[in-house]
Amino acid sequence: MAPTLATAHRRRWWMACTAVLENLLFSAVLLGWGSLLIMLKSEGFYSYLCTKPENVTNSTVGGSAEPEPEELSLVNGWLSCKAQDEILNLAFTVGSFLLSAITLPLGIIMDKYGPRKLRLLGSACFAVSCLLIAYGASNPDSLSVLIFIALALNGFGGMCMTFTSLTLPNMFGDLRSTFIALMIGSYASSAVTFPGIKLIYDAGASFIGILVVWAGCSGLVFFNCFFNWPLEPFPGPEDMDYSVKIKFSWLGFDHKITGKQFYKQVTTVGRRLSVGSSMRTAKEQAALQEGHKLCLSTVDLEVKCQPDAAAAPSFMHSVFSPLLVLSLVTMCVTQLRLIFYMGAMNSILEFLVRGDQKTVALYTSIFGALQLLCLLTAPVIGYIMDWKLKECEDTSEEPEEKEGTQGEKKQKRDRQIQKVTNAMRAFAFTNVLLVGFGVTCLIPNLPLQIFSFVLHTIVRGFIHSAVGGLYAAVYPSTQFGSLTGLQSLVSALFALLQQPLYLAMMGPLGGDPLWVNVGLLAMSMLGFCLPLYLICYRRQLERQLQQKREDSKLFLKINGSSNREAFV
């Protein structure tokens, strides 16, 4: 039942559009935890932990019993208290941490087995999580513990759908970074899903009914994946052209090859047949000049015409590359800055308004609504990553021979250098916005915090899109999931520092976030290390390209032709 890669390529626009919608409704919905928390309290989850003393109503007149009504309150007829808040937040902490920690094995599995099975599993887990929450709401006094399992499944299923959607942009060629940014933007904007559901809930809809319908919609995701997603992983645009698919039984081997593999192998056969018998003794020298082994038969053609090992670095080589290490530093610093603000936002607003809960609720709602900006702003960074790639040439392929006019025409940009240049601009721009966000956080002005909300939302969409675009541009497509999972795991572990920072702000600093924000602003300067390294890396690539062109000119001058293979 699974379609082929060629069929999936024809359906790529349908798959991309539905993936954006599915990410918006089913991926990182746990980021809207504040709205879900209110609904869980209204349904009585862990309300049994709140015990109302018998003498509360009789002693509220006395001064000694005044704190009691502040600790116990009624939400939709259910008791709410501090113990309930703590246990529900513990459930959220467990679910969100498992969500981040599982990204690395999830990426490795996806790179090995492809996205189809993981997406089917993720949609099923999300549906089960909705049904578990609904079942727990039917009898919260006995089934509240199900919220732990439900949130873990919710986060796991959402991350499965997010990760698998990041492979779809491989089918869009030079627009790959733009589509990666669109997928990440829809993932980041999914924080508005629970606030939207809360509006339906406040309008009078049944909480259990909403969750059952939501689980049914997740079932539609399952069937969409079942009928449209192929078994094979999506290769990168540099690895395959989906428009060519031929069975080469007449060449002596029966497997199917596509795209550049087709071009490489047929071109090699043509060159082999065009070489005279006097040239055959020098075949090894010709192979060295060409940069890959010359195949002498259909058996050699099938076995030996493989990409050079240097062209596809190993996973460990990619992990210890300076580019990945600096991207991890940038991501860790940015994640800590963003997550601390999300966790401490209510406390920061309370400090600014001196405890006015209505104002805090208003600004919290504004912050939640602004999360949709991620869907609009994330593709901007993807467009920066894809800037002028269509005007570039791929130096990994042999240039076509141009007689007479080669020196007159302006040389095209090198694709790899343009990718590095675009990534440098994207990370520099993102870090400037991050520093600007840190500066606005230092100013104790309430209306200015709306501008901080906007910067926070933009940076959150930009940083994920920039990292995803960088990994897709620099590293092999078969390592994309593993490297993205490693980045998510490391940044999630580093982001755990937000808890001691929050305790320091609420304890010794008396709720004043000034010094914590100063420290985080200073740490944000580390984010400029990556664009500075990319500048040096670009210069290195430019020197290599210049040397290659000089060698090509020298060879042309000696032999009178740009075709090296004619002079073995």
Swiss-Prot record:
The keyword Secreted does not apply. Residues 402-415 have a biased composition (Basic and acidic residues). Keywords: Cell membrane, Glycoprotein, Membrane, Phosphoprotein, Transmembrane, Transmembrane helix. One of its GO terms (cellular component) is plasma membrane. The modification Phosphoserine is found at S274, S278, S297. Gene3D superfamilies: MFS general substrate transporter like domains. The keyword Cell membrane applies. Expressed in intestine, kidney, brain and adipose tissue, heart and testis. In the kidney, is detected in epithelial cells of the distal tubule and collecting duct. In the intestine, is expressed mainly in crypt cells of the intestinal microvilli and epithelial cells in the base of the villus. Expressed in small intestine enterocytes, the kidney proximal tubule, thick ascending limb and, to a minor extent, of distal convoluted tubule epithelial cells. Glycans are attached at N55. Disruption phenotype: Homozygous knockout fetuses mice for SLC43A2 display a reduced intrauterine growth not leading to a prenatal lethality. In addition, fetuses mice show a marked reduction in the concentration of almost all amino acids in the amniotic fluid. Pups show growth defect, metabolic alterations and early postnatal lethality. Induction: Regulated by protein diet. Its main location: membrane. Pfam families: MFS_1. One of its GO terms (biological process) is methionine transport. It is a multi-pass membrane protein. This is Large neutral amino acids transporter small subunit 4.
